[in-house]
UniProtKB/Swiss-Prot annotation:
Reactions listed under catalytic activity: L-quinate + NAD(+) = 3-dehydroquinate + NADH + H(+); L-quinate + NADP(+) = 3-dehydroquinate + NADPH + H(+); shikimate + NADP(+) = 3-dehydroshikimate + NADPH + H(+); shikimate + NAD(+) = 3-dehydroshikimate + NADH + H(+)
Keyword annotations of the record: Amino-acid biosynthesis, Aromatic amino acid biosynthesis, NAD, NADP, Oxidoreductase
The UniProt record lists the keyword Metal-binding: no
Species name: Salmonella typhimurium (strain LT2 / SGSC1412 / ATCC 700720)
Binding site for NAD(+): A132, G133, G134, A135, N155, R156, K157, D158, K205, C232, V233, Y234, N235, G255
Domain of life: Bacteria
Protein name: Quinate/shikimate dehydrogenase
Amino acid sequence: MDVTAKYELIGLMAYPIRHSLSPEMQNKALEKAGLPYTYMAFEVDNTTFASAIEGLKALKMRGTGVSMPNKQLACEYVDELTPAAKLVGAINTIVNDDGYLRGYNTDGTGHIRAIKESGFDMRGKTMVLLGAGGAATAIGAQAAIEGIKEIKLFNRKDDFFEKAVAFAKRVNENTDCVVTVTDLADQHAFTEALASADILTNGTKVGMKPLENESLIGDVSLLRPELLVTECVYNPHMTKLLQQAQQAGCKTIDGYGMLLWQGAEQFELWTGKAFPLDYVKQVMGFTA
């Protein structure tokens, strides 16, 4: 690809960043579509995010992806949030229109699209959702919008727990879905929740390098063949949770599905053009 002075820059702001497949995926898509943009990853955390956003404006970047740990903080630095992003309380995409920043969240729509593509109808179903960060809450919000009946969210009693409670309140007030929040340490409640769930979704970084040998499921007997298990982590591709689920006979959806579909929506928001889906799936080796 020959980059000229006419090219615009799109970024990804996250920490850590080296594991991300987004730069490779987006640049392959941009090159295939023949569009004058280049996508670069920048190591940015909560302490440098404000400066990075000022840099985005100063450099007239077209926009940026936002990943851990910046997704919730990023809401404070945009001029406008979509209704879904307000419900989530986190964004993963910023579009810069001449200095006016719009915040979107494509994590939820991407993950739910991957579930739909598998043939699973979530309407009226119950989900156990692990985590309360930006990705997890985005998935929960979109699932509620799409008609899921109940979400049982489990998170450790950390800084995200109160945010999870606030998220549940927003969803309960604005949708027909019922969201409850429980401490992940409450194994009795967790066991009961899984026994009646239709979907188990991991929205945490457990399973991601360097936590690739870990899973939040300590007792694999909790996994049943009729349970759909979905994963946000894509590096490694086959997380310990997915291995446990497949051994238990569960249908699974790996993290590539979310990466692909959320990235496709980001691409279209930044460029206004269709994402070359089939080409990207082929060159990236995605099974989703």
